[in-house]
Each structure stands twice: as structure tokens, then as C-alpha cells.
A protein has these predicted regions:
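Amphipathic alpha-helical scaffolding segments comprising HEAT/armadillo-like alpha-solenoid repeats
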Residues: 9-24, 45-61, 81-93, 112-127, ...
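Short inter-helical turns and helix N-cap capping residues of alpha-solenoid HEAT/ARM repeat scaffolds
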Residues: 28-29, 60, 65-66, 94-99, ...
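Alpha-helical oligomerization segments
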Residues: 219-221, 234-237
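Structural detector for internal amphipathic alpha-helices that build alpha-solenoid repeat scaffolds
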Residues: 1-11, 30-45, 66-82, 99-114, ...
Length: 250
């Protein structure tokens, strides 16, 4: 450690880590926090990136200051490119908060194929653990909705059994457009289970109809649950009235 580090200056990993406390200082004037952000922006260190990421975990008043600071931090981290990837992913693993900022950064920094891989890997990790706050799962499931990759559907499937209804609905929304055959049975079981909440049932109905799946083996139970405009046709396919057929645009 150099003399500058001892007296509050310098660009060491230890100094970068200590500045996290100032970056996450919610109360008082913004000057100390903004100075710390500027100092960290000048440090080309993974520890500096980690401390900058912590700024996304707090909200300050006024809202305009909060937004301006977060966008400034976003730009500082994004400019680091590849060097920021591992600190961002570590932050995402360790924090339930601010996952939307982390995913936005990864989307901007990574090539498309590596971004999909990151989404898949983080979803696989989350599918194996209980989380009190579902925010991170919801953010990643929302990202999965728009990704066209064969790994997405099997990775999302386990979330149909999550404890949180919001997570189940997020998984259904991601699975619906994928028409993943292995999802048919789990979605039908979820729909017809007596303990399933009504809003989850609604999500399941929409997902099954979007996938174009049949309800064979569950027809009687499914029909008893269907609201308008959904129905089961003669072939046993769950459909929405007025929806375009296969190969037709909406």
C-alpha cells in the first residue's frame, strides 16, 4: 500500500473496496457520493467495478439525482467492456436487488450468443435455490421471453414449480411462445392442480393456447376452468377465439 492509499488517495484494490461505503451513502449531501463515483471511475480495477455496481442497490432523493447518478455509473461500467463482465456476474449472483441494471449491462457488453449463455447459466443457478425476494428470477425470466435459443425452454421449465406465483407466471410467459413439447404436461398439471391460484391458471391457459398444445388427458378439467375467449376445439387443442391460426399473422 502506498502513501496515497494511507491518506485517502491512490488507486489500490483496497481503496476501491473502501469507497463502496461512500457510494452507498443514502443520506446527507450528494457530494461525497458523487466524488467517490468519480474516483472509482478512474480506477481500472475489478474492485472498483464492484463498488460502482453497489450504487444500483440504493435509491436517493430527489429522484432526478438518483437517476442521473445511476446512468452515470452505468456508462462508467459499460465503458470497461469485457473487463466488467465477471464483476457484473458476481454482483448478480450475490445480490437480489438491482438485477435489472446488471442484465442491462450484460446485454450491452456481451455479444448476443454469450449473453444468452449468461442468462441460461444464471437461470440454472436460480432454479436450484429458494429466494425470499423473487425480483432476480422475474428479471431473468423476462429476459428469457425474448431470446430464441434451444436452451431457454428446458432451463425455464423448473420455475413452474417455484414457490412464488409471480415466478410461475413469469415462467409461463417465457414458455408460451417457445411451444416446447416437454412443457405441455407440466403446464396442464399446474393449470388443473386444485391449489393453483386463479391468476396462475390464467397464465397457464394463455401459455398453453400460445403453444398450440392439446389437452388430451385433461380435457374435462381444463374446460371447467376456461374463461372466454378460450375453448378446446374438436381436436383437443386449446385455443383463443379470434386468434390467428398457424402461419397467420395477428
Amino acid at each position: 500500500m502506498g502513501i496515497l492509499d494511507i491518506f485517502g488517495g491512490g488507486k489500490s484494490p483496497e481503496r476501491a473496496t473502501k469507497l463502496k461505503a461512500k457510494v452507498t451513502q443514502k443520506y446527507g449531501g450528494p457530494e461525497a457520493r458523487q466524488k467517490a463515483i468519480q474516483q472509482l471511475g478512474e480506477m481500472d480495477l475489478p474492485e472498483a467495478t464492484a463498488s460502482l455496481l453497489a450504487r444500483f442497490t440504493i435509491t436517493v432523493e430527489p429522484a432526478t439525482t438518483d437517476t442521473d447518478e445511476k446512468e452515470h455509473v452505468f456508462g462508467l461500467i459499460r465503458s470497461r467492456g469485457e473487463a466488467a463482465v465477471e464483476p457484473i456476474r458476481t454482483f448478480l449472483r450475490r445480490n437480489d436487488q438491482a438485477s435489472s441494471w446488471a442484465m442491462r449491462l450484460l446485454r450491452d457488453v456481451l455479444p448476443a450468443d454469450r449473453y444468452v449463455t449468461a442468462v441460461v447459466e444464471h437461470l440454472r443457478e436460480l432454479s436450484e435455490v429458494y429466494t425470499r425476494d423473487p425480483e432476480k428470477k422475474l428479471v431473468l425470466l423476462h429476459e428469457a421471453q425474448s431470446l430464441d435459443d434451444s436452451r431457454i425452454a428446458p432451463t425455464v421449465l423448473p420455475f413452474l414449480e417455484d414457490m412464488a406465483d409471480d415466478v410461475k407466471i413469469g415462467a409461463l410467459r417465457a414458455l408460451g411462445p417457445k411451444a416446447y413439447p416437454e412443457a405441455r404436461e407440466p403446464m396442464l398439471k399446474l393449470l388443473t392442480a386444485p391449489e393453483t391460484a386463479r391468476r396462475v391458471q390464467t397464465g397457464a391457459i394463455e401459455a398453453i393456447a400460445h403453444s398450440g398444445f392439446g389437452v388430451q388427458g385433461y380435457r374435462e378439467k381444463v374446460e371447467a376452468l376456461l374463461p372466454e375467449p378460450f375453448f378446446v376445439d374438436k381436436a383437443g387443442i386449446l385455443k383463443r377465439r379470434g386468434a390467428p391460426g398457424p402461419g397467420q399473422s395477428e
